[in-house]
Amino acid sequence: MDFVKQFLYSCDHMGFLALTQETWQNRWFPSQISLTSDVACLQSLNPRDLEFYKFLFSFLAMAEKLVNFNIQALVADFHSHDLEHYYTEQEAMENIHGKVYANILNMFFKNNVGEMQKYAREIVGDEALAAKLHWLHGRVSEAKTRAEKVLVFLLIEGIFFISSFYSIATLRVRGLMNGVCMANDYISRDEWVHTRAAALLFNTLVPDEEKPSPEWIGALFREAVEVEYNFILAKGRGVSHVNVADINRFLEATADRILKSINVGPVYGTQPPPNCPLVYTGCLKNVNFFERESSDYTTAVDNDL
């Protein structure tokens, strides 16, 4: 690469420049999420619910690092100032997510870091989580072309956390954990922006001749949805307000929506459940009457999802 072009910035991708600016305008911080009122809500969770949410937040907290590792590997395959700038911002947002999850875990574990780390080590061996991670590791290892790497990354961003976000959002239906629900709103919206970015990367920087067939892509998405469904089927049994059938419908609808964004036809034709508790694209945005704050971004929002 030409030395000057490598080090002297000039706009080379309007799409990623726009996403970078959107990220700046929609930035939020861990200090904006108050968990003060959420502490008392822990007493309203039965033992099954409490264990489920401890598990989910421990998984999500560790997964943030996984996402950043994949970003660094992915960006190395492309050369674009604006793409690199955008993904630097995305890595920063993933770090914010990690800090918020750490705060939530401190609440669940009563600031006992030793117990938190011991629990995290234990759940890595959980059968449902191990199956999910095994599938992901296999797909990452098998992805040899840039197109395949981007598609796997797209699934990590768009499918890999959906059942967790959906399950956390059901706490709002129960009038519980306003702070946790607000954090979940912010993070799930951020992840949808990240999904859009991965789709933009696939559409604009991966040549058509490198892209797999629509049939191959559709089969990959079916695999991912099945893995995510099996995960929540195994972990969500008996948890209050967690409707696994509705989550599966939402997974299928989300997969179709992502496929459409990369110009591939739907594989399910499923509509999202009408009572979806998530507030980003594809669901109705609602503000619980009992919440102190709206789930909108605190700063001025551009292109609100």
Curated annotation (Swiss-Prot):
It is an enzyme of class 1 (oxidoreductase). One of its GO terms (biological process) is DNA replication. Gene3D superfamilies: Ribonucleotide Reductase, subunit A (1.10.620.20). It is a single-pass membrane protein. Its cofactor is Fe cation. Fe cation 1 binds at residues 64, 94, 97. It catalyses: a 2'-deoxyribonucleoside 5'-diphosphate + [thioredoxin]-disulfide + H2O = a ribonucleoside 5'-diphosphate + [thioredoxin]-dithiol. GO terms for cellular component: host cell membrane; membrane. The keyword Ribosomal protein does not apply. CDD domains: RNRR2. It comes from the Viruses. Keywords: DNA replication, Host membrane, Iron, Membrane, Metal-binding, Oxidoreductase, Transmembrane, Transmembrane helix. It is found in: Host membrane. One of its GO terms (molecular function) is ribonucleoside-diphosphate reductase activity, thioredoxin disulfide as acceptor. Its EC number is 1.17.4.1. The active site is at residue 101. The chain crosses the membrane at residues 150-170. Fe cation 2 binds at residues 94, 157, 191, 194. Belongs to the ribonucleoside diphosphate reductase small chain family. Heterotetramer composed of a homodimer of the large subunit (R1) and a homodimer of the small subunit (R2). Larger multisubunit protein complex are also active, composed of (R1)n(R2)n. Ribonucleoside-diphosphate reductase holoenzyme provides the precursors necessary for viral DNA synthesis. Allows virus growth in non-dividing cells, as well as reactivation from latency in infected hosts. Catalyzes the biosynthesis of deoxyribonucleotides from the corresponding ribonucleotides. This is Ribonucleoside-diphosphate reductase small subunit. It comes from Equine herpesvirus 2 (strain 86/87). The lineage of its organism: Viruses, Duplodnaviria, Heunggongvirae, Peploviricota, Herviviricetes.
